């Protein structure tokens, strides 16, 4: 494939997964890290690895002498040494030393983003003194965030100053660090977007995800984020623009806040693979690690290579953290191995409380199904989620990734169509419900039918009374199977609707059920879904 050798500064789990991706592409990797048991070195049995620190100029120069490209799995490296080795040898370094230097100082990162018109929380530089922190409280109010400018990750280096009485403790915790303060951002969710940038400056964003933190460490990631499509797209655009402002190629993790008023703010950026992107290994066309390797070596980056594997793919990433019990976290991994569509990734690290030991990816066509599997893996339920097992929990008809669209010409049809919705809920099938009239809103009907496959729908149930043109009109504009439900009217008892729907011309098929029989329409939709995906094939009987 490619004869380039990639040198990686840092040998942790991110380096390990970069190595895995590079090996599949026949790209040699050399690691700079202390010791021979670093996670990245464990899976790459070469004699060329450098035993040393990624902050040692001599070790960096030694690594550069063996490689064509240098990259990082951690931003806290000696960027001055990178600049010097690049001047001396001309070696390619991605991301650029300038970018790494800007990003690893979080206050400089904020100033850079502001300069480039990227929305961030208001912040200011502060001194390590009680008087300075009291001034911040007077300026921003309480609470506010006190942060270390450097060497801060996984919540380390952050302190919430809730009121004036917390200032002494904040100074003790962040003793002797360069600091800055940030105005409190009243967020409703934390989101993240992975963005990969090519050598020629093109950017490609992965789906927007939602991150859940516990004790300041990422605990779970929901992909895609449980927000509406507009917010998802706005987050991708914001992330793209933020990454475009930095020079150099590679993958970037962009963390952001979704505020209570709906605005988005960039929290911080990582110039490397990121914990919030681990789900991409199993849920996307190309993992964040392979995308990074492609970007820094100039390999092809085709359109849509950062998309989810299918339009309806849903995923949850669960971090495996070290606990108080030695190797106790591996009990959770064993449960994951018992769970269909759950993949375990361990990093080869010695257990320590709070340490990232690995992660688990759960992938399905339904977020509810992913959550059900997550609950078993975490031990909150003792029932192994078999393929045919479905809970009876109701799924809202406003699911962000529905598989079935339930439409009708008027809200007067809802009492009939709700019977079908209840069946879909019973079988835990995600669906959406909306009013689409063939006569009153024809343009909306056309857009709905045309866009349905792109949004991940697999089947449409259309209820209509009277002239009942809706099912046939929708079927004429979508490749999806359409099931028509004749709704009983006030004059001809629904026979007119039945005759209208069932007599579609050749080439425009519409499956037609009995008058008012939305129940059978839903069961037929479930059968269609099962036939198209054996992994989610449902077992049921007629009643």
From Swiss-Prot:
SUPFAM superfamilies: Glutathione synthetase ATP-binding domain-like (SSF56059), N5-CAIR mutase (phosphoribosylaminoimidazole carboxylase, PurE) (SSF52255), PreATP-grasp domain (SSF52440), Rudiment single hybrid motif (SSF51246). PROSITE patterns: ATP_GRASP. GO terms for molecular function: ATP binding; metal ion binding; phosphoribosylaminoimidazole carboxylase activity. Pathway: Purine metabolism; IMP biosynthesis via de novo pathway; 5-amino-1-(5-phospho-D-ribosyl)imidazole-4-carboxylate from 5-amino-1-(5-phospho-D-ribosyl)imidazole (carboxylase route): step 1/1. It is an enzyme of class 4 (lyase). InterPro entries: Ade2_fungi/plant, ATP-grasp, ATP-grasp_carboxylate-amine, ATP_grasp_subdomain_1, PreATP-grasp_dom_sf, PurE_ClassI, PurE_dom, PurK. It holds the Pfam family ATP-grasp. Keywords: ATP-binding, Decarboxylase, Lyase, Nucleotide-binding, Purine biosynthesis. The keyword Lyase applies. ATP binds at residues 137-192. It catalyses: 5-amino-1-(5-phospho-D-ribosyl)imidazole-4-carboxylate + H(+) = 5-amino-1-(5-phospho-beta-D-ribosyl)imidazole + CO2. Coiled coil: none annotated. GO terms for biological process: 'de novo' IMP biosynthetic process. Residues 110-297 form the ATP-grasp domain. SMART domains: AIRC. Its EC number is 4.1.1.21. In the C-terminal section; belongs to the AIR carboxylase family. Class I subfamily. This is Phosphoribosylaminoimidazole carboxylase. It comes from Ogataea methanolica (Yeast). The gene is ADE1.
